[in-house]
A protein has these predicted regions:
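Short, aromatic- and glycine-rich surface loops/edge beta-strands on solvent-exposed regions
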Residues: 88-100
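Exposed aromatic-hydrophobic patches
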Residues: 76-84
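Beta-sandwich strand segments
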Residues: 102-110
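Structural beta-strand segments of beta-rich domains
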Residues: 37-41
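Solvent-exposed serine/threonine-rich low-complexity stretches and specific carbohydrate-binding patches
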Residues: 63-75
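Transition segment at domain starts
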Residues: 1-34, 115-121
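Beta-strand signatures of extracellular beta-sandwich domains
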Residues: 54-58
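Asparagine-centered strand-capping/turn motif at beta-strand->loop junctions
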Residues: 42-47
Length: 122
C-alpha cells in the first residue's frame, strides 16, 4: 500500500460511494481496467477512517478472482492481482469490506457491480 490519496486518471470513474450507516469511507475506480493480469482499482482508505479495509474482485457467480491485503487509513492500493485473465466487458463485483482495527470484527461491506473496461494505458 502507498501513503496518501492517489492521482487517478479521470476516465477510470474514481469515486467515493457511501451508504447511510456505513462506519467508514473509501474510494475506488468504477471503470476497472486490466494491466498485465492485475485489475487497476485504486482502492483508497479515507484518512478520517479508523477501519481497515480490503477489496475482493468477484465474478458474476461470486467466485473470488483476487483480493487486496488490509489497507490502513490514508493508504491506497492501485492493483489487485487476478487469478485468471478477464476480457473487456466481463461483469465483475467489487466487494469492499471494513474491519475494526483492534478486533478485526466486521465494520460492514459494500458491493459494486461493474465490468472490465479494457486494457489500462497507465
Amino acid at each position: 500500500a502507498e501513503q496518501g490519496a492517489p492521482d487517478v486518471p479521470e476516465d477510470l470513474g474514481y469515486s467515493s460511494p457511501y451508504k447511510e450507516g456505513m462506519s467508514y469511507r473509501f474510494s475506488v475506480c468504477g471503470n476497472v481496467t486490466i494491466d498485465g493480469g492485475k485489475a487497476v482499482v485504486y482502492l483508497t482508505n479515507a484518512e478520517e477512517n479508523t477501519a481497515l479495509i480490503k477489496l475482493r474482485v468477484l465474478d458474476e457467480n461470486g467466485e473470488m478472482l483476487g483480493e487486496t491485503g488490509l489497507i490502513k487509513p490514508n493508504e491506497y492500493v492501485k492493483y489487485v492481482a487476478l487469478s485468471r485473465e478477464l476480457p473487456q466487458g466481463t461483469k465483475i463485483k467489487l466487494k469492499i469490506m471494513g474491519y475494526e482495527p483492534q478486533t478485526y470484527r466486521s465494520a460492514g461491506a459494500a458491493t459494486l457491480n461493474t465490468t472490465i473496461g479494457g486494457q489500462s494505458d497507465q
